[in-house]
Amino acid sequence: MPDALVAWLRDVEELRSLPQRYARAIDARDIDGLALLFHPDGVVDGMRGSSPVPAYIDGLRDAKRVFESSMHVLGDPLISHEPGSATAHLDTYAVVHQLDKVDGSGGDATLGVRYLDDVVQRGGRWVIRHRQARILWHRASAG
């Protein structure tokens, strides 16, 4: 197999794992681990508006928990990446389960989310430079 093809396949596999690493970090509330997945000069456009990555990470660190736990279940990302390029785009669907509201009501929520990520190579690894997180649907249940 030519070296260029092997390098591209390695990149695609690393890109495929990026949303999974995000899901595991956010569900575990591993904010330091989460920060490593983003470019420090990046931007996140999400449920709370648009934020530079440092402000987004600080907001997550300071946020009060609403639910006891969450689980992101991801579809396989659609990856756009040209061989040899240091940029790529990921389009990932997710179903996010949020369980047991901390206010004691026991309510749960389930969301359909679409993550659109522009990613770049930085320091030999892929990181998210611009994320758009779009809620496609939301369902809440009482406890």
Predicted regions located by residue number:
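Short, cysteine-centered beta-strand-loop-beta hairpins and adjacent loop/turn segments enriched
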Residues: 97-107, 138-139
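Short beta-strand edge/turn micro-motifs at domain boundaries
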Residues: 87-89, 112-143
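Short, surface-exposed coil-to-beta transition loops
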Residues: 72-74, 110-115
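A solvent-exposed, acidic/Ser-Thr-rich amphipathic alpha-helical stretch
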Residues: 31-97
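Beta-strand elements of well-folded, non-transmembrane domains
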Residues: 94-100, 119-121
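Short aromatic-glycine motifs in intrinsically disordered, low-complexity regions
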Residues: 66, 106-108, 120
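Short, low-complexity N-terminal intrinsically disordered segments enriched in polar/charged residues
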Residues: 1-28, 32, 36, 40
